[in-house]
Amino acid sequence: MQQDNVTKKVNILGDANVDMILNLSDKQNLREPSLFSGGSSANVASGLSKLGIDVSFFGSLGKDIYGKHVVDEMKADGIDISNLVLLDNYNTAMVIGVVEESSERHFFLWPPINGAHNQYTLDDTSRKDLLDCDWLHVSGISLRFSPVKETMLEAMRICNEKSKIVSFDLNLRSELWGLSESFKETVLEAVSYSSIVFGNLHEEILLIYDGNEDTLDKHISEKQTFICRDGHNGALGITNKDKVISNAIPISPIDSVGAGDAFNTGFIYASCCGKDIEESLDIGNQVAAFKLLGSGARHLPTKELLDDFNKKYQIN
């Protein structure tokens, strides 16, 4: 990858937590559980910062040992945490991930409700800081519970009104919480404020709409792009006029936890560097493939590591 001149600033609002990973992929050589920082939004913040993007994080954690773990890692990654709030009366959430022999994963959340990440609200200072960016990224994991749901929708709306790029990862987790009509309406409201919508093609995007990939473009406004992740098939970029396909990189995955966040990281990074949709999809796939070769959602590359990865796999 050639040296890129990055000038865009990205604000990320949403979830941060810790991940406890139980890896059962090799049952003959079981490993001890591993603790990582996690959270869909925080993962993207970490990945973008490692790639040289100026990143600020907006969210809340418990004032506990796990919250300190997350804060320390964000500081080490160079993320601005001026708008990260530590709460006395709520616990930092833990996502317990079980990795199967196929590298597929299953998640369990503790506490199941009222985690600290769901309590974030904006004040006058954070609203002002929120608009100090070129790009806002959010995740649908924050649409399930109040007050962070209302906070996220407000943030998306005001950034959209100020012509900021707003990217929204659907992150429905319908296998955990279902997909009620009222929640679907909330998701569609968030989509209406979005410039870019990320999601798994079959498990999320087609679930929200009519299940027909051929008519998906009819749901996309003139100023929107849908980025459809499709596992080993790669990814699609769809506008109301065009469709671009980027093939996945053939590798043997070790751990798929956080692969979608890694893809989003690569796509946003490339877009901030001025790449077109095709090259941004390609770089999204490269960062996702790099992540798949390591454990935990934070196995994410610097620019130098990504260059080395691309040379190894002979990616131009």
Where are these regions (language model features)?
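Glycine-rich phosphate/adenosyl-contacting loop at the front of the ribokinase-like
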Residues: 1-79, 252-254
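Active-site metal-binding loops of divalent metal-dependent hydrolases
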Residues: 16, 40, 141, 170, ...
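Short, conserved phosphate/pyrophosphate- and ester-handling motifs at nucleotide-, phospho-/glycolipid
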Residues: 48, 200, 260
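Anion (oxyanion) recognition and catalysis
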Residues: 49, 75, 157-161, 191, ...
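Conserved phosphate/ATP/ADP-binding segment of small-molecule kinases
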Residues: 162, 172-244
